[in-house]
Amino acid sequence: ATFTIRNNCPYTIWAAAVPGGGRRLNSGGTWTINVAPGTA
């Protein structure tokens, strides 16, 4: 499965969607995560 995280806020956020860390997303930025089938 593929998930796309988009920052719709007018400011920078830190998206934490994976173990061990996350990613800085500027306003309007996106982050695509590919997850293996069967991942819980």
From Swiss-Prot:
It comes from the Eukaryota. Keywords: Antimicrobial, Disulfide bond, Fungicide, Pathogenesis-related protein, Plant defense. Has antifungal activity. Inhibits spore germination and mycelia growth in F.solani (IC(50)=67.0 ug/ml), C.gloeosporioides (IC(50)=32.1 ug/ml) and a Neurospora isolate (IC(50)=57.5 ug/ml). On the 2D-gel the determined pI of isoform 1 is: 8.9, its MW is: 22 kDa. GO terms for biological process: defense response to fungus; killing of cells of another organism. This is Osmotin. The keyword Membrane does not apply. Belongs to the thaumatin family.
